[in-house]
């Protein structure tokens, strides 16, 4: 039987793809793309939030604090969370409120975990002002320099609330609050002990000494006052509130302080001012060359001729025969013939003439900084030396015209003996001085009448007592002196007994009034004389009224001597237990003591310093009290150069150095050799 071949295996047929499967794949592709895009967007949002959070933290904390956060000096200054501080202060309730500063409120924060209590200062930034934020950053930047002193309040941390723009600083808690609250408001019994007050004064001095002599760079506090002096549980004083403090730069020197000294000198600005004041040429005869060269401050201008011919010869003097020189004059001349040369106060133009000088020997001697007008169009010239060459024709013509105006018709009358010429020069000098004085007096009287009219208008409008105090500050010293001169002696004496205390405050702030008259109206309107007599800080100036030094008022440059001045006022407040300006409805005797600084100066002149001491103090050490008042008066001197340094003050208080003496102007018995020369001429 024939075999059958098996049929070959046929692979199964693949089903053809249908239209429904392709449509399903087309639907899943957009879902995958949408999911990936959503995930990418979420990741971008998270990264953006992280970057924003980092940038916000960098804006809250200063850059130098962040960059140096790894240094051991910054380990104490930590960042607190806002929620943690809010729980510790019971949501900043009134029960934990300790006080209110210039730009923030202070609360007590209790931490249950550590058991410690801290002080939390919430900076006020809701008013739209950046001052609170500036103080916040300023204190953070200075925190690294203030570590290591027991006399400075330590900054422990900071925090910020992004939503409410709350900037918070965390300090160590000072149980007895500020010196102003303990001494002037609550009048703590512990401060009635003199030893405790003296210890507080020493602690404050050591704290300022740490800022000036131990910190590198030097820190200037700028706002030393009782409200910024904090007391711990043992009444140990510490300096706080460094919101207005500044770091002294390396290139800062005392040139500004020296300029204050130079302002008191009588310096001739230019030749034009000399001509306007004198309006005369004084002729003086001299037989020798007794010309004394002194400092440039005592410069006068003279036309000088040397004696060549014999005294018996008589010859005409022409302007071309005169040599021009810058002549320096001393008040006490070297020879009797120089006695008639005008003093620097008169700044006259002297013509010292004689015969026999040729025009070729004319020389221009430049010896002063104020010789610019001699060197016009003369290519600068050689400063400080003798300059050869011809002098400009218009200069010689001017000199000749001035000499011809005053030359007598007869030469015999002009060339006379020395005594006669000196007497003639004195008479001319007096006569020529009358016109400027009369002109000045007329203008001054007009100004006085204008002021009287303004005062009458103010009285009619019924201004408040604050505006009357403001008028005391704006009172002109010259006007008051002329008005007092017109009064009889009895009325003038009664008036001085009431107004002397105002002179101290207005005198200390006179430099501020002179520098910025246009801005001072707004500045002085900010001075709030409260019922308690306290004076508040003003945002337009650095410091506090009555505590700020006169040279740094109106936005001036701060220096260590500004803190010294403020310490002097603070020392008087601590000794007397009174505010620097305390106006109350008391008898007239108390009203005269309203200005503490003027009262202290008056008592020093009368030799009654102990009357300044607080009557409620017991166990008083009189020597220490006199020492404190003397140091305070040394600190309150107008010239910053004359004030002592804080290192010297600490040595005085600790007894290392000898007790200081009162300043000369406050001494009750001035010595015989009075340095100021009387302006009255001997007859």
UniProtKB/Swiss-Prot annotation:
Annotated GO MF terms: ATP binding; protein serine kinase activity; protein serine/threonine kinase activity
Membrane-spanning ranges: 31-51
Catalytic residues (positions): 223 (proton acceptor)
GO CC terms of this entry: plasma membrane
Binding locations of ATP: 98-106, 121
Main EC class the enzyme belongs to: transferase
Keyword annotations: ATP-binding, Cell membrane, Kinase, Membrane, Nucleotide-binding, Receptor, Serine/threonine-protein kinase, Transferase, Transmembrane, Transmembrane helix
Pfam families listed in its UniProt record: Pkinase (PF00069)
Topological relation to the membrane, as annotated: Single-pass membrane protein
Segments on the Cytoplasmic side according to the record's topology features: 52-683
Protein name from the UniProt record: Receptor-like serine/threonine-protein kinase At2g45590
Organism whose genome encodes this protein: Arabidopsis thaliana (Mouse-ear cress)
